[in-house]
């Protein structure tokens, strides 16, 4: 169930422009605030605030990858609930991602409902 007044902002990081726009739109239409970034470095340059409630994070990014970004945030004391999205095969990422305790791992192409359900769980 979507909150009428979401508790904060969803941070989205994906290097695919069209996917980033589509996912941002889906999140906004569901009633959530969202900030979207094309790279981990762009998110880190802005910084994470108390207003940010979860990450939707591509695993395979140029430069700093999604798993490295999650570890960097953990090391700085920012343990945001994370939903990983990826085009990689499950066998390539299941073990390493499990260690980061994500709310969900969604394999591209994923269903909008699965994404929004995961965001709801992250914000609960």
Language-model features: where?
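As written
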Residues: 52, 66, 96-105
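Non-catalytic signal-transmission and effector/linker regions of two-component phosphorelay proteins
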Residues: 1-11, 17-21, 35, 44-45, ...
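Acidic, metal-coordinating helix/loop segments flanking the phosphotransfer/catalytic sites
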Residues: 36-54
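Charged docking surfaces used in two-component/phosphorelay signaling
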Residues: 21-29
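Acidic catalytic/metal-coordinating carboxylates
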Residues: 38-39, 65-68
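A Lys-centered signature of the CheY-like receiver
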Residues: 108
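Hydrophobic/aromatic residues positioned on beta-strands within the core alpha/beta folds
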Residues: 85-86
């Amino acid at each position: 169930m979507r909150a009428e007044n979401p508790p904060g902002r969803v941070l989205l990081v994906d290097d695919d422009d069209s996917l980033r726009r589509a996912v941002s739109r889906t999140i906004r239409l569901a009633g959530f605030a969202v900030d979207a970034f094309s790279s981990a470095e762009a998110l880190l340059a802005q910084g994470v605030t108390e207003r940010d409630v979860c990450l939707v994070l591509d695993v395979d990014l140029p430069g700093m990858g999604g798993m490295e970004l999650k570890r960097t945030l953990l090391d700085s004391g920012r343990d945001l609930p994370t939903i990983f999205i990826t085009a990689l095969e499950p066998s390539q990422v299941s073990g390493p991602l499990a260690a980061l305790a994500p709310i969900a791992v969604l394999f591209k192409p994923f269903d909008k409902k699965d994404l929004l359900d995961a965001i709801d769980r992250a914000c609960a």
